[in-house]
């Protein structure tokens, strides 16, 4: 089982914690990580694109000129696709791009993402993360104590309003709960700062 240092909020090492091998110690599967990121990014797309077809464009109800005798090509509507200002043929319509990967694949992806952070030595485990009041200054101080000066994902075991509000204005820092941890967030941040309680919760779900 991989062992990592356990820190307090002052940045002091207070011991070690053993991480579950089946969650934090597997060989990262790059292909599964790729598939999971594509799935998440697809679900973020708005899908609100829309063009009008000839039935939806205003006007064009009357035949522009008679069928025969003018020497011109026959036309039925000034809103046909070949006309300027006419409708679009097979244009985009609103749709959802989201789809689901199999549950086993999704679980393997998050395990691979977490294991990659352990392999890169980019995981920081805290014994506890508590703030008496929402203060950005205090959160910055804690991150500095832990030598976390880059993009960081903070994972708590449950919703912590003070932590969330304190980190909200720090560029590159995101706070999620153990239940809300996902592949895109883990890979999109350089450091993973996770509480001991959150580790236990993640292992309980994924092990």
From Swiss-Prot:
One Gene Ontology term, aspect cellular component: ribonucleoprotein complex
Annotated region (Disordered), positions in chain: 45-78
InterPro entries: Ribosomal_uL4, Ribosomal_uL4-like, Ribosomal_uL4_dom_sf
Transmembrane segment boundaries: none
SUPFAM superfamilies: Ribosomal protein L4 (SSF52166)
Keywords: Ribonucleoprotein, Ribosomal protein, RNA-binding, rRNA-binding
A Pfam family the protein falls into: Ribosomal_L4
Domain of life of the source: Bacteria
Gene Ontology biological-process annotations: translation
One Gene Ontology term of the molecular function aspect: rRNA binding
Subunit structure comment from the entry: Part of the 50S ribosomal subunit.
Family: Belongs to the universal ribosomal protein uL4 family.
Function: One of the primary rRNA binding proteins, this protein initially binds near the 5'-end of the 23S rRNA. It is important during the early stages of 50S assembly. It makes multiple contacts with different domains of the 23S rRNA in the assembled 50S subunit and ribosome. Forms part of the polypeptide exit tunnel.
NCBIfam families per the UniProt record, alphabetical: rplD_bact
Name by which UniProt lists this protein: Large ribosomal subunit protein uL4
Protein's organism: Geobacillus sp. (strain WCH70)
Organism taxonomic ancestry: Bacteria, Bacillati, Bacillota, Bacilli, Bacillales
